[in-house]
Structures are given as structure tokens and as C-alpha cells.
Amino acid sequence: AGEFKVSFIRVTHSIPDSFGICVDTKEGRIVTTGDFKIDLTPVGPEMEIHKMSKIGVEGVDLLLADSTNAEKDGWTPSEKNVVDSINEIFDKASGRLIISTFSSNISRIQQLSIIEKSLLLEEV
């Protein structure tokens, strides 16, 4: 019990409006990132990297971080690059395309819809 302060840090993820949380208590600071991907050219809003960095410089007593494939070397391409590749596949396709994606990847589903609509408009 007692007073505490909560602040939110925008993170990039396939789920829109994802945030990390910073909790300041009299006992110390706890930060949980939620699942995130550092994407410098995201389809949606940018990650608040400077805010996350400032919190880190000020000091964190407990960090709970989650990032899929964080243990693998390298980095994951930006969602913008993925969309460009999908657009290229659509342009080259001469027949039916079957597309699979995570149901939680709302931005990808939205981008597929935008590409599809633009192709339908080109046919008219």
C-alpha cells in the first residue's frame, strides 16, 4: 500500500496502442515493457525510445521485458519493409493469392486491405 506513480511508454508492436508501464514507488522503480519490437519506420506511431532511455538513465530497480526472438542475432525488418514486399508480391501475382498472418497483427491486416483496395481501384 502507499502512493505510487504510473506512467506509460508507447512501444511498437503488431497490436495497436501497445504501451510499456513504469511504476514508481517509495521502494523503487519497476518497468514492464510488454511485448515490443524496436521499429524505426513503423506503420503506426513510433516507439517512445527517448522516454524509455530517460527512464533507464534515471534508474530502474526491476525490468520486466518481453520481446519475441530477442535471443536471436540481428534484427527484425521494419513493418514498412514487410508492407513494401507484400505490395511487390501483389503486383507480380497473375492469379489468386492466399495470405496468412497473425490475427493479432492488426496493422498488417489493415495494410493488406489498403493494398487490395488500391488494386481494385486500378482495375476500374
Tell where the protein language model's regions lie, with residue ranges.
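His/Asp/Glu-rich metal-coordinating catalytic cores
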Residues: 1-124
